[in-house]
C-alpha cells in the first residue's frame, strides 16, 4: 500500500479511528433538529430551575491534591512497564528506577513540607 511494509493494518486502523468520529459529527449535524426556541435554551436541572450561578470559585487545595495525584499516577505509568521487564533489564535499569523514585519522593516531601497535602 505504501513504502513501509507491515504498517497497512496500522494505517487502516488510523483511518477508521479518524473516520468514525467525523462520521458521527456529520450525521448529527444532518439529522439533528435545528429549532432554537426559548424553551430549548433554558438550563435543566432535575426538573427544577437551577439555584445559583454555574461559575463558582474552587478552593486551591483541590488543585494541589489533583496535581500531586497526577504526578504519582504518571509515576505508576512509567514504573509498570519497568516492573514487567525487570528481569531482562539488569542492574543499571534498577538503579535508574531507584533514582526516579527518589526524585519523586523528594517532590512528595517538598509538597508535604509546604503543607500542600494538609486540609485546614
Curated annotation (Swiss-Prot):
The chain crosses the membrane at residues 6-26, 64-84, 89-109. It holds the Pfam family Oxidored_q4. It catalyses: a plastoquinone + NADH + (n+1) H(+)(in) = a plastoquinol + NAD(+) + n H(+)(out); a plastoquinone + NADPH + (n+1) H(+)(in) = a plastoquinol + NADP(+) + n H(+)(out). Its EC number is 7.1.1.-. Keywords: Membrane, NAD, NADP, Plastoquinone, Quinone, Thylakoid, Translocase, Transmembrane, Transmembrane helix, Transport. The keyword Ribonucleoprotein does not apply. It is an enzyme of class 7 (translocase). It comes from the Bacteria. GO terms for molecular function: NADH dehydrogenase (ubiquinone) activity; quinone binding. One of its GO terms (cellular component) is NADH dehydrogenase complex. NDH-1 shuttles electrons from an unknown electron donor, via FMN and iron-sulfur (Fe-S) centers, to quinones in the respiratory and/or the photosynthetic chain. The immediate electron acceptor for the enzyme in this species is believed to be plastoquinone. Couples the redox reaction to proton translocation, and thus conserves the redox energy in a proton gradient. Cyanobacterial NDH-1 also plays a role in inorganic carbon-concentration. NDH-1 can be composed of about 15 different subunits; different subcomplexes with different compositions have been identified which probably have different functions. Belongs to the complex I subunit 3 family. This is NAD(P)H-quinone oxidoreductase subunit 3. The gene is ndhC.
